[in-house]
């Protein structure tokens, strides 16, 4: 396959994945926006009640916070809201990851060759939920880890603002920042998993076409990356454990080696 057709095929694969990434981002922004509004209202209401509970001019402390029934009620509400956010993310990602696998698998068509389809829904569900990273965690575990981290850091910011005598407006700003951090982590998980799924789907499609070798193809911009550039056009047996993606937002892919 010459460079022109290789670039076109790589661009086509990336377009399929980018379409699904954009669909996830659109829905994820809605989920985060709703959750953030609910959580911040709870925190702001609790902080204002705390400030109103002490004598005028007195400095509130974290110990005062723990005496408020409102604080413990807020904890339950925030836990419920973040749990719902996690559930929605898991459901959304699971569905779109499956869709992405099928989009890539059936989006690959090699002229002059006949493919024997060997994929089904159960197989795809198994593939997208496989643990493949060195830390031994699945993408869903990372989502729940982030939910727990977010709840902890939101509470930490509340305590810090109380201890430092910050105004409620400063607390709101810090909470918004932490929701932004969580959203970006979720986006990184999405992009990494989509890239991995693209590789798995392509490998299976090539196998079903009877392809013997694949070629690591770095996006034109990625060729300046020392890791991606070093592997550009390196060949592997089809089905080999190729290190893709190499980094977050990696746009490299595997292309079939087809004799002209």
Q: Language-model segments: which ranges?
A:
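N-terminal leader/targeting and assembly helices and adjacent pre-domain segments
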Residues: 1-176, 260
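Acidic, glycine-rich two-metal-ion catalytic cores of nucleic acid-processing enzymes
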Residues: 173, 177-260
């Amino acid at each position: 396959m010459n460079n022109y057709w290789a670039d076109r095929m790589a661009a086509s694969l990336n377009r399929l994945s980018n379409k699904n990434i954009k669909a996830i981002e659109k829905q994820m922004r809605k989920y985060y926006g709703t959750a953030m509004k609910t959580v911040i209202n709870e925190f702001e209401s609790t902080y204002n009640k705390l400030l109103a509970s002490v004598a005028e001019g007195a400095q509130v402390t974290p110990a005062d916070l723990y005496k408020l029934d409102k604080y413990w009620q807020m904890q339950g509400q925030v836990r419920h809201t973040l749990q719902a956010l996690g559930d929605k993310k898991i459901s959304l990602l699971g569905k779109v990851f499956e869709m992405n696998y099928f989009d890539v698998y059936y989006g690959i068509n090699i002229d002059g060759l006949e493919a024997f389809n060997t994929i089904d829904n159960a197989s795809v569900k198994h593939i997208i939920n496989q643990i493949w990273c060195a830390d031994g965690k699945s993408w869903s575990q990372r989502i729940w880890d982030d939910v727990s981290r977010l709840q902890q850091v939101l509470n930490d910011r509340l305590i810090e603002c109380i201890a430092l005598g910050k105004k409620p407006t400063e607390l709101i700003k810090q909470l918004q920042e932490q929701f932004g951090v969580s959203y970006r982590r979720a986006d990184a998980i999405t992009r990494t998993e989509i890239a991995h799924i693209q590789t798995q789907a392509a490998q299976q499609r090539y196998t079903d076409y009877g392809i013997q070798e694949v070629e690591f193809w770095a996006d034109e911009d990625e060729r300046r990356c020392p890791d991606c550039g070093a592997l550009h056009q390196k060949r592997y047996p089809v089905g080999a454990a190729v290190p893709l993606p190499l980094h977050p937002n990696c746009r490299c892919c595997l292309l079939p080696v087809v004799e002209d």
